[in-house]
């Protein structure tokens, strides 16, 4: 096996769940043809997390071999909501919400993928002028029985839960994207398999070569149970501050450390195998490996210097209990005092009042290093508030 074949083999094996059709994809990669690598995203939320990063890293690896990424911004399908893995119909988003989410999503996307080797396309380029006859013609290519073969649809149908007609259209619309951009390969998670294969079918029906499909594993979130998801709060966002990424890495269950190393870092497989052996024999403290993981991630997303500073701050603030030298400030209106619950929300130390109250009840809130539990406590200018293990804000 020559160097090029070895590199391609590594890309198609590590961090990959399934390739359809693997031999055909290998031949394409070795042919010298510049491939169009399709990745679509629905900007239904404004943030990318490590779960998305698994596929994005594959795209970057293939860009480095000279291939072109075609990024589809699903400004139409986002208003429907991808039903993949959903147990209920998702709420529709407004066009304004979708555009706002897409802006921040693209900024984060290019932290991982090479912008100069990426073609960005918006679904509205072809769907803005789609007529009813076009919808009928497209939907006539498939049957309701085919759509209900999806695992998530089948479960909802069997349970008597509603499935909207727009959701049935979703896989066809995603497939039509592949036709419009002449996709050679489409990327996605294993929960997207049905949609990706519909793309192959539709391309063939319309006289194009069917795209290859590369599926990546689903990354388990920091709770160790569910798929990483912002809605579940078990995510590590790629745009979060380095100190926040570092702290969240420390919270992942020990049994997930190796999976994270494999899927979202470039640590050699031989070194990961050594980590596995050391953990199995009690030769390494898992925290040491989590710190290594955090530094690797922050170096990818920011810089080596940012990684070292985040490591040092974690040691000072979390392990030694020191107050950080630099912390966010939250300005009080006219210098007046404010209820601690309201301050926690205003300073973005918690996302909701219920979360803030829960922190108080669990003893997770301090004012000037003194634990408090009374939600009626007030915060005044100069106070330093700590929420959870590592979040601080100064009232000014």
Swiss-Prot record:
Motif 'KMSKS' region covers 227-231
Q: Where is this motif: 'HIGH' region?
A: 43-52
Q: What subcellular locations does the record give?
A: Cytoplasm
Its Enzyme Commission number?
6.1.1.1
Residues reported to bind ATP: 230
Query: Is Aminoacyl-tRNA synthetase included in the keywords of this UniProt record?
Result: yes
What SMART domains does the record point to? Answer: S4
Any one GO molecular function term: ATP binding
CDD domains given in the database record: S4, TyrRS_core
Reaction(s) catalysed by this chain, per the record, are: tRNA(Tyr) + L-tyrosine + ATP = L-tyrosyl-tRNA(Tyr) + AMP + diphosphate + H(+)
GO cellular component terms, alphabetically, are: cytosol
Main localisation, per the record?
Answer: cytoplasm
InterPro entries reported in the protein's UniProt record: aa-tRNA-synth_I_CS (IPR001412), aa-tRNA-synth_Ic (IPR002305), Rossmann-like_a/b/a_fold (IPR014729), S4_RNA-bd (IPR002942), S4_RNA-bd_sf (IPR036986), SYY-like_C (IPR054608), Tyr-tRNA-ligase (IPR002307), Tyr-tRNA-ligase_bac-type (IPR024088)
Residues in S4 RNA-binding domain copies: 338-396
Q: Which UniProt keywords apply?
A: Aminoacyl-tRNA synthetase, ATP-binding, Cytoplasm, Ligase, Nucleotide-binding, Protein biosynthesis, RNA-binding
Q: Which GO terms describe its biological process?
A: tyrosyl-tRNA aminoacylation
Give the multimer and partner information: Homodimer.
The record's comment on protein family reads: Belongs to the class-I aminoacyl-tRNA synthetase family. TyrS type 2 subfamily.
Q: Name the NCBIfam families for this protein.
A: tyrS (TIGR00234)
Q: What does this protein do?
A: Catalyzes the attachment of tyrosine to tRNA(Tyr) in a two-step reaction: tyrosine is first activated by ATP to form Tyr-AMP and then transferred to the acceptor end of tRNA(Tyr).
Give the protein name, as stated in the record: Tyrosine--tRNA ligase
